[in-house]
C-alpha cells in the first residue's frame, strides 16, 4: 500500500525518564548510541556511534565530510571541542577574485570551491581518545552495517532530500551517491550507501588517519583536482581539532555555556544577557510582549555577531567585551516595547546543523553537533569512499568592503560557523545538555526554549514543542502557523513583517534536550526530542 505521508493531526510527545539516555533526530542513531552504553561504553562513546550513524541516515544534514562541535561534562568540569576545519592553503582573496570576480561577496555556495577541511571525523577521534571507554572501531560498527544493508528513509529526511535534489543533481558524485534511481528515495524506500561503508571501514581501521593523510585524503585530493578545486592531502594532514574553554552567560540563576567564536553561539548569550534586563515572567509565555522582547533581543545579538564574529585571532573585539553586562544593559535600552526595529551593530569595545546529546548514569554528559552546513553541503561527494563534503567555505567573506572584514577568506583560517552545542549549569554543576539545529535558527532556538524553561517553568518537551519564530533580516520574521493568532496580530501591529509557515520541518530547527534530575545513578535524567524531525530519545 502507498500511504499518504502528510499528517493532519497534532501529535503529542512526552518526556523520557531514564538513567542512560541518547536523544537524536533519527531513531537508528539513538539506538546505536544506546547499544554502545549496553556494551559498557559511556555517553561519549554513545554520541560518537550516533554521530557516525547519522551521517548515513540523515545525509542531507551531515556526512563524513562534516564539521562538528561538542561540550562535554566529564564529571568535574566542562570541556569544549571545536572540530571545524580551515581553508585550504591556496584560498586567498586573489584565488576567488580570479575565479569568480572581484564583486563576489563570498566563496561559492555549492561545488568544490565551497569545501574547507572537514573536521568531524577528527573530532570523533579526539573525543574517543580523551573520554571514550570502547575501542574506536567498535563505535563505527552500527554505521557500517547501516551503510551496507541500508535503511528505510523516514518522512522528514525524505522531504529535505527531495527538496535539495534539483539544485544538486549535477554536482560531482551527487547523483551517483544519492540518486540511485535517478531521483530521491521515497518515504519508506530502502537506501544503501555501500561506498560510504568502505570509507567508514577505512576510518575505523586507521582511527581516522585514512581521512587525514591516508587513502581517503589522497582520493579527495585527486577528486578535487579533477573538478577544479584546490584542497589537498597536505591540507587534510595538517588538521587538528581544538580543545576550547566554553564562554558563558548567567541567566535567572543558571549559566548557559556555548563554544566561543568562530561560531555563533555567543548570539544566544548576548540575547539572554539583554533579556536579563526585563521581567519576562510578568508577561504571558505565548503573549505578544514576551515574544516581542525576545525577537528584539535576538536582533540586537545578530547585529553584533554578524559584524564582529570570526576566527578569534582576527576579531576586533573579544567575546568578553561583547558580553559585558554594562554594554548589554545599554543595548537593552534600545528596545521599544511597542515597536519593531532594525538594529545596527553596537560598539562593545570599552577600556577594557544535526544535533544529538547523551548522558550516562556515571554523570558524563555530552552536547554534540555536526553539519554539512546547507542541505547536502557542497553537493560534492567523493565517490570511492562516499565522502559527502560540507560547504563551510561559503561562510567566508571575499568582499574587502563587507560588513565583517575579520571574516575575510585566508589560507588556514576557519570561517564563521553556525553550528553550536549548548550546556546549562547551576552553581558549577551540570543541569542540561541541549541544542537546536538549523543555521541561524540555532541561537534563536537556544534562547526561546531556555526562556520557556527558566522564566515560565515549562518542561523541556513542552518548551521544545511550543511554536517558534525565526528572525531573518530587517523587520522580517517567520512564525509557525501554530502560534497564537492574537500574538501574531499583536506582533504585526508593532511593525514585525511576518511570514506564516505551515511546514515547520524546514524553517524552525529541531532540538534535543537532556535535563539532569539529581544523582544520575539514582534519579537519572529527563529527555525531550523535537517533533519537527524523525528522531527520538531512548534510554534504560
Q: Model regions: which residues?
A:
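Glycine-rich phosphate/pyrophosphate-binding beta-alpha loops
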Residues: 257-265, 353-357, 367-380, 436-443
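M16/insulysin-pitrilysin zinc metalloprotease superfamily fold
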Residues: 265-281, 424-432, 440-464
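Short, small/polar residue-rich loop motifs at catalytic or cofactor-binding pockets
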Residues: 243, 350-353, 417-419
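Internal maturation/activation junctions in enzymes
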Residues: 277-372, 384-385, 392, 502
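Extended C-terminal subregions enriched in glycine
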Residues: 412-414, 446, 455-506
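Active-site rim segments in enzyme catalytic domains, especially the processed small/beta chain
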Residues: 56-73, 77-82, 230-232, 364-432, ...
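Noncatalytic scaffold domains of N-terminal-nucleophile
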Residues: 1-31, 35, 43-213, 217-263, ...
Amino acid at each position: 500500500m502507498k500511504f499518504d505521508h502528510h499528517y493532519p493531526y497534532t501529535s503529542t510527545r512526552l518526556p523520557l525518564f531514564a538513567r542512560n539516555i541518547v536523544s537524536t533526530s533519527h531513531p537508528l542513531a539513538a539506538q546505536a548510541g544506546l547499544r554502545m552504553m549496553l556494551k559498557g561504553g559511556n555517553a561519549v562513546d554513545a554520541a560518537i556511534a550516533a554521530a557516525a550513524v547519522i551521517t548515513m541516515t540523515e545525509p542531507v544534514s551531515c556526512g563524513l565530510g562534516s564539521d562538528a562541535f561538542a561540550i562535554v561534562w566529564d564529571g568535574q568540569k566542562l570541556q569544549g571541542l571545536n572540530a571545524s576545519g580551515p581553508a585550504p592553503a591556496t584560498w586567498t582573496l586573489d584565488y576567488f577574485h580570479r575565479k569568480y570576480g572581484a564583486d563576489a561577496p563570498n566563496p561559492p555556495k555549492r561545488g568544490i570551491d565551497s569545501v574547507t577541511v572537514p573536521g568531524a571525523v577528527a573530532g570523533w577521534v579526539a573525543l574517543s581518545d580523551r573520554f571514550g571507554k570502547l575501542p574506536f572501531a567498535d563505535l563505527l560498527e552500527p554505521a557500517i552495517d547501516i551503510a551496507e544493508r541500508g535503511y528505510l528513509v523516514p518522512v522528514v529526511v525524505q522531504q529535505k532530500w527531495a527538496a535539495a535534489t534539483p539544485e544538486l543533481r549535477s554536482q560531482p558524485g551527487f547523483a551517483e551517491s544519492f540518486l540511485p534511481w535517478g531521483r530521491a528515495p521515497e518515504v519508506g524506500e530502502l537506501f544503501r550507501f555501500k561506498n560510504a561503508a568502505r570509507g567508514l571501514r577505512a576510518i575505523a581501521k586507521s582511527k581516522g588517519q585514512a581521512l587525514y593523510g591516508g587513502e581517503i585524503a589522497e582520493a579527495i585530493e585527486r577528486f578535487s583536482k579533477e573538478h577544479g578545486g584546490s584542497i589537498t592531502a597536505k591540507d587534510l594532514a595538517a588538521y587538528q581539532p581544538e580543545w576550547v574553554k566554553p564562554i558563558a552567560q548567567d541567566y535567572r540563576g543558571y549559566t548557559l555555556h556555548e563554544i566561543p567564536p568562530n561560531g555563533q553561539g555567543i548570539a544566544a548569550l548576548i540575547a539572554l544577557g539583554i533579556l536579563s534586563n526585563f521581567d519576562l515572567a510578568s508577561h504571558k509565555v505565548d503573549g505578544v510582549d514576551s515574544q516581542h522582547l525576545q525577537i528584539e533581543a535576538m536582533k540586537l545579538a545578530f547585529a553584533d555577531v554578524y559584524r564582529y564574529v570570526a576566527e578569534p585571532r582576527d576579531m576586533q573585539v573579544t567575546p568578553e567585551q561583547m558580553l559585558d553586562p554594562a554594554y548589554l544593559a545599554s543595548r537593552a535600552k534600545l528596545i521599544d516595547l511597542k515597536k519593531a526595529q532594525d538594529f545596527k551593530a553596537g560598539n562593545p569595545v570599552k577600556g577594557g546543523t544535526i544535533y544529538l546529546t547523551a548522558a550516562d548514569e556515571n554523570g558524563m554528559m555530552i552536547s554534540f553537533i555536526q553539519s554539512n552546513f546547507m542541505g547536502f553541503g557542497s553537493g560534492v561527494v567523493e565517490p570511492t569512499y562516499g565522502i559527502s563534503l560540507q560547504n563551510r567555505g561559503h561562510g567566508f567573506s571575499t568582499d574587502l568592503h563587507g560588513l565583517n572584514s575579520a571574516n575575510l577568506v585566508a589560507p588556514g583560517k576557519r570561517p564563521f560557523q553556525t553550528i553550536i552545542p549548548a550546556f546549562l549549569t547551576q552553581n558549577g554543576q551540570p543541569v542540561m545538555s541541549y541544542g537546536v539545529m538549523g543555521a541561524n535558527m540555532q541561537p534563536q532556538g537556544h534562547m526561546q526554549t531556555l526562556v520557556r524553561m527558566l522564566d515560565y517553568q515549562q518542561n523541556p518537551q513542552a518548551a521544545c514543542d511550543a511554536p517558534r519564530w525565526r528572525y531573518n533580516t530587517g523587520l522580517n520574521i517567520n512564525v509557525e502557523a501554530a502560534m497564537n493568532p492574537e500574538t501574531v496580530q499583536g506582533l504585526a501591529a508593532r511593525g514585525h513583517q511576518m511570514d506564516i509557515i505551515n511546514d515547520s520541518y524546514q524553517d524552525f530547527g529541531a532540538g534535543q534536550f537532556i535535563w539532569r534530575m539529581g544523582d544520575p545513578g539514582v534519579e537519572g535524567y529527563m529527555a525531550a526530542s523535537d517533533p519537527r524531525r524523525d528522531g527520538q530519545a531512548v534510554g534504560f
